[in-house]
Amino acid sequence: YMSASMESILTGYDDPRIAVYFAPCTDEQFKNTYRGIRQGTCFSHSHYAGLSKLTVTQTTDAPLMTSSEIWFLRAEAALRGWTDEDEESCYRNGVITSFHQNGIYQVEDYLNSERMAFDFEDTYDNGNNIEARCKVSPKWDSEADKEIKLERIITQKWIAMFPEGCEA
C-alpha cells in the first residue's frame, strides 16, 4: 500500500509519478484516486483493502542505482562544496531523469511548481491524520538556506528512488 508520506507529497505536488508507482483506489468511495495508509497504524484489512496498492510485483526490475539517484548525489555534493558543479543544475537533471525513467516527459511545469505537500487525512480514522512533514516545493530556490536546499534535493531523491525510499 501507499504510505501516508507518499500520498502527502505526491498528491500535494500533483506529481505524475504517482500513477507509475501506485494503482488507483478500487474502493467505491475513493475510486480512481490515490490514498495511502499511515505507517504503524493498527487497522482492519477490510477497511483499507481498496486503497492504493504498489505497482511493484515479483517480476519488477530492481535497479541497484539509477542515473537520477546519481544526479541527486551530485547535487548534494555540490551543495556541500565537495565539487565545483552547480547544485541547481544537478537537482534539475535528477528530477528530469527520474521523470524520463518513468516514461514521463513533461517536466518543466513540475520543476517550476510551488505546490506543497498536503496534510495526510486518514480515510477511516481521523486520529491517524498528520500534518505534512515536507516543507519544500519542487521549485528550486537559489536564495534558500542550505538546509532547505538539502531538504529539496533529498525529497526528490526519495521520490525518485521509489520503492527503495530507505536508501534515499
Feature-to-residue mapping (PLM):
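Extended ligand-binding clefts on enzyme/binding-domain cores
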Residues: 1-71, 78-168
